[in-house]
Every structure is written in C-alpha cells, then in structure tokens.
C-alpha cells in the first residue's frame, strides 16, 4: 500500500510561538522533521501542510514540497485530510501524519503505526512509549491505555488508570503508555474521522484522537522504545538543541575515527 506522509505545520502555536520556524541545529524545526521522515524511508512520498506563507517559503528554500491548506482546521488530522483529498495524492492508500514538532521520531514508531493499518488490525494506527509513574500526573504527557489486542481504550492528560492503592504502582508499567504524535490512517478512516464534528471529549481534553474513539472507530497502538520527545515549549527547544548537538558531535567523532 503506497504511503503518503504529511507534516502539519501551524505557525500559531501558543506555548512555543512560531514553532515550525524556530531553529534546531541551525535549521527550522519543520525542515528537520521533514528530513527525518525522508531519512527513515517509511513513506513513499512526504509533504508539509501549512496555512502560512512563511512556512511555505522556509520549506521552498530547502526544496521541500508544500501544500497550502485552510487556516481554520480544528486539528492536524483535518489538515492532513485536506491534503489527502487533492487529486495528485489519490493513489496513496495510507496517510501518515507526523506532527511537525517530532524531529527525533523513530522508524519503529512510523513503521509500527503503518503496519497496524496495512495488517488490518485497526483502520488507524499510532505509537506509544513506556511512561514512568512520576509523569502520570503531568497534563502535558498524554497517556493511553489499551485492550489486550493493542486497541486503544482511552487517551487522557489525566493519570489513567487511577491508582487507588499506592502499593499497586508496579502493575501500572504494562498498562499505561505515553502517546507519540504519529498517526497512520486508512484513507476511508481518515475521511470518516473528519466527517464528524469535534467531540465534547476531544474539546475537553484537547486531544483530537478522542473523536474517532467516541464514534467507535478503532485505533491500534504500537509500543516502541522511548526516544527524545517532541518540542512544545521553550525548555523543550533548549533540550532538543542540546540533544541535537550531542548526536551530531558523536556522529562527527565516529566519522573522523573511521
């Protein structure tokens, strides 16, 4: 099944203003995410979807294909659906949404999400990593709990499941994961998703994936090893640049030693 990767890049983020254009290793974050997706080789083609000409111009300077979309989309998935509906992309059976703040996303996360769809486990696939007990209370960490067949039961910013007895903390490890900002969709599932208005649960939690769940559409979850997280705040950006410098210093050292 041909896979189209779409990177939604919205300039109007509140926690990190102008996020797609902030610099990571000397280049805009959106450029680094595109480079990462192409490097991993899971998708057959990759484009950036944005509603702002400054993002379009930054991508054009790097030869990155861009699709201009409407500015009023309630979520990244709605933006991806606008791209998928364009005639030039009609041959792609699977759409892969890689959020524009995930420059360190792993191949396992992308390939695992796609495999959920292509194997028929669920019409939507996503990824998650192990979560530590001390981060369960953090609302910026999105948690997911799954059924035994890897289908998501619920996503939340709250601590789920509720730990009634502190002595049971050890049993949480295999039951809860931290969500990673990646989605793969079968084309029909993507069309269904955006045909529904935002659900009250989605609006309360500010989590777009609760829309299909609330309507009975299954989301399969692949669990992968933890990697450097996404970039949502100024502190995240500092951390990401430090991580980038360490990675590239190590790569340069290995190259000189070879």
Curated annotation (Swiss-Prot):
The keyword ATP-binding does not apply. Pathway: Nucleotide-sugar biosynthesis; CMP-3-deoxy-D-manno-octulosonate biosynthesis; CMP-3-deoxy-D-manno-octulosonate from 3-deoxy-D-manno-octulosonate and CTP: step 1/1; Bacterial outer membrane biogenesis; lipopolysaccharide biosynthesis. It catalyses: 3-deoxy-alpha-D-manno-oct-2-ulosonate + CTP = CMP-3-deoxy-beta-D-manno-octulosonate + diphosphate. Pfam families: CTP_transf_3 (PF02348). Keywords: Cytoplasm, Lipopolysaccharide biosynthesis, Nucleotidyltransferase, Transferase. The keyword Transferase applies. GO terms for cellular component: cytosol. One of its GO terms (molecular function) is 3-deoxy-manno-octulosonate cytidylyltransferase activity. It comes from the Bacteria. Its EC number is 2.7.7.38. It is found in: Cytoplasm. GO terms for biological process: CMP-keto-3-deoxy-D-manno-octulosonic acid biosynthetic process; lipopolysaccharide biosynthetic process. NCBIfam families: kdsB, PRK05450.1-5. Belongs to the KdsB family. Activates KDO (a required 8-carbon sugar) for incorporation into bacterial lipopolysaccharide in Gram-negative bacteria. HAMAP family: KdsB (MF_00057). This is 3-deoxy-manno-octulosonate cytidylyltransferase. The lineage of its organism: Bacteria, Pseudomonadati, Gemmatimonadota, Gemmatimonadia, Gemmatimonadales.
């Amino acid at each position: 099944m041909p896979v189209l990767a779409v990177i939604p890049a919205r300039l109007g983020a509140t926690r990190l203003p102008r996020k797609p254009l902030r610099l990571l290793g000397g280049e805009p974050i959106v450029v680094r995410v595109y480079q990462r997706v192409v490097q991993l080789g899971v998708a057959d083609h990759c484009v950036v979807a944005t509603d702002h000409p400054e993002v379009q111009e930054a991508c054009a300077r790097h030869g990155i294909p861009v699709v201009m979309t409407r500015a009023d989309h309630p979520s990244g998935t709605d933006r991806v659906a606008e791209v998928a509906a364009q005639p030039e992309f009609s041959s792609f059976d699977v759409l892969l949404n890689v959020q524009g703040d995930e420059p360190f996303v792993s191949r396992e996360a992308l390939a695992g999400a796609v495999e959920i769809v292509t194997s028929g486990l669920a019409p939507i696939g996503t990824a998650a990593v192990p979560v530590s007990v001390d981060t369960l209370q953090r609302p910026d960490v999105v948690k997911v709990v799954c059924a035994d067949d890897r289908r998501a039961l619920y996503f939340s910013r709250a601590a789920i499941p509720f730990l009634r007895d502190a002595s049971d903390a050890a049993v949480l490890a295999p039951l809860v994961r931290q969500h990673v900002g990646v989605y793969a969709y079968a084309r029909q599932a993507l069309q269904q998703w955006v045909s529904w208005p935002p659900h009250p649960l989605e609006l309360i939690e500010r989590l777009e994936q609760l829309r299909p769940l609330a309507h009975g559409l299954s989301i399969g979850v692949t669990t992968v090893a933890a990697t450097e997280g996404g970039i949502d705040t100024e502190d995240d950006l500092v951390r990401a640049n430090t991580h980038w410098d360490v990675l590239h210093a190590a790569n340069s050292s290995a190259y000189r030693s070879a």
